[in-house]
Amino acid sequence: MPARQSFTDLKNLVLCDIGNTHIHFAQNYQLFSSAKEDLKRLGIQKEIFYISVNEENEKALLNCYPNAKNIAGFFHLETDYIGLGIDRQMACLAVNNGVVVDAGSAITIDLVKEGKHLGGCILPGLAQYIHAYKKSAKILEQPFKTLDSLEILPKNTRDAVNYGMILSVISCIQHLAKNQKIYLCGGDAKYLSAFLPHSVCKERLVFDGMEIALKKAGILECK
């Protein structure tokens, strides 16, 4: 990348998180998402800084906005984990101490202490759980149903499927978190937070990490 331009405010640029399903943006502190087919219609005029976990969607972005810049190499997250996804790195960069849960197409759980990533695990996303039940047995092909509590044991198959799914995710998070604060992001974050008393939803968590990375790289001026 040539001499890096410096920006004084987030209003002057666009952050982009390219996922496996959707492409997410933060522009002027507003969040929105797009399918790859609709990118050109967005008509973004400002400079785009992005991260990506999907090569095909990244190519789609660059076809529409060829000057967009990948910031993956602009920062360093202290970790011994090999192959940590860039989206997980950015979310962890935004948390100094605590547990980071990204509840998207997969559910990732990462521990951060004093800015160092200690490790983590990956679970299927809620939609993948439902798909697995469907493939396992016809009777387990049940629609997703939100639960209000895990205190009451289910008395029908639909509730039993959803109960087992949610309990397995919540138990794993609680086992790793102990009494630490839990930061949730991703599409199912708000739903899972209802079962986690020490949690907070931070829908901008990945973008907060990207902002920190840009500041560390001198691209975004610190205030």
Swiss-Prot record:
Residues that, per the record, bind substrate: Y81, G85, I86, D87, R88, T157
Any GO BP: coenzyme A biosynthetic process
Positions of the catalytic residues: D87
SUPFAM superfamilies reported in the protein's UniProt record: Actin-like ATPase domain
Pathway(s) per entry: Cofactor biosynthesis; coenzyme A biosynthesis; CoA from (R)-pantothenate: step 1/5
Residues bound to K(+): D102
Amino acids binding ATP: D17, I18, G19, N20, T21, H22, I23, H24, S105
CDD domains hit by this protein: ASKHA_NBD_PanK-III
InterPro entries: ATPase_NBD, Type_III_PanK
Cofactor dependency: NH4(+); K(+)
Gene Ontology cellular-component terms listed: cytoplasm
Subcellular localization: Cytoplasm
Subunit structure, interactors included: Homodimer.
Cross-referenced NCBIfam families: baf, PRK13333.1
Family per record: Belongs to the type III pantothenate kinase family.
Name the UniProt record assigns to this protein: Type III pantothenate kinase
Gene it is expressed from: coaX
